């Protein structure tokens, strides 16, 4: 039986527990996941692509079923390069579905082999977004439980905020 692989793309700036939930759910369906860190030149990320890759690898415990990579191109070009045409996208709410549905259809228009698999994050993390985590952390709020411990530690280091108890 061939190994089933999917790509899970995102900015992961920072990686949240919602992202980890999608990775864990994805591994129930696929034998292998490529977590692909997107480099968007129009954004100013808090963490570099290399930092995000390292944080993801550490958070997944260097699981051999998870490859962490990065890309600087259209998703369809990256998918074509990897030869993996199934992409996992996490959904938190109905509003996410509308955007992801449009994106999936555009990607399918650009690359007919493209397939999107939508995965729910679950009730524990449906309200968590990387943008909200960055905002809370920037103002010294406690992000414990919203991000993996290694990410919380790195956020505190990078932003110069104290650890919460």
Curated annotation (Swiss-Prot):
Keywords carried by this UniProt record: ATP-binding, Coenzyme A biosynthesis, Cytoplasm, Magnesium, Nucleotide-binding, Nucleotidyltransferase, Transferase
Positions that bind substrate: 11, 43, 75, 89
GO MF term set: ATP binding; pantetheine-phosphate adenylyltransferase activity
Catalytic reaction equation(s): (R)-4'-phosphopantetheine + ATP + H(+) = 3'-dephospho-CoA + diphosphate
Cofactor: Mg(2+)
GO biological process: coenzyme A biosynthetic process
Keyword Protein transport on entry: no
Keyword Magnesium: yes
Highest taxon listed in the record's lineage: Bacteria
Enzyme Commission no: 2.7.7.3
Record-annotated site: Transition state stabilizer: 19
One Pfam family linked to the record: CTP_transf_like
Subcellular location field: Cytoplasm
A GO-annotated cellular component: cytoplasm
Known partners and oligomeric status: Homohexamer.
HAMAP family cross-referenced by the UniProt entry: PPAT_bact (MF_00151)
Function (record text): Reversibly transfers an adenylyl group from ATP to 4'-phosphopantetheine, yielding dephospho-CoA (dPCoA) and pyrophosphate.
PANTHER family: PHOSPHOPANTETHEINE ADENYLYLTRANSFERASE
Protein name: Phosphopantetheine adenylyltransferase
Species for this entry: Anaeromyxobacter sp. (strain Fw109-5)
């Amino acid at each position: 039986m061939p190994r089933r692989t999917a790509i899970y793309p995102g900015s992961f700036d920072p990686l949240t527990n919602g992202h980890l939930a999608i990775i864990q759910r994805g591994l129930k369906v696929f034998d292998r996941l490529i977590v692909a860190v997107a480099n968007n030149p129009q954004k100013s990320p808090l963490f570099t692509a290399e930092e995000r890759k390292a944080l993801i690898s550490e958070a997944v415990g260097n699981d051999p079923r998870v490859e962490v990579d990065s890309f600087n191109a259209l998703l369809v070009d990256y998918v074509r390069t990897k030869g993996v045409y199934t992409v996992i996208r996490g959904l938190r709410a109905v509003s996410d579905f509308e955007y992801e549905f449009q994106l999936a259809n555009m990607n399918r228009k650009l690359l007919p082999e493209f397939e999107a698999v939508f995965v729910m994050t679950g009730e524990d993390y449906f309200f968590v977004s990387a943008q909200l985590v960055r905002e809370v952390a920037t103002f010294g709020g406690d992000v414990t439980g919203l991000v993996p411990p290694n990410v919380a530690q790195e956020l505190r280091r990078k932003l110069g905020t104290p650890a919460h108890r």
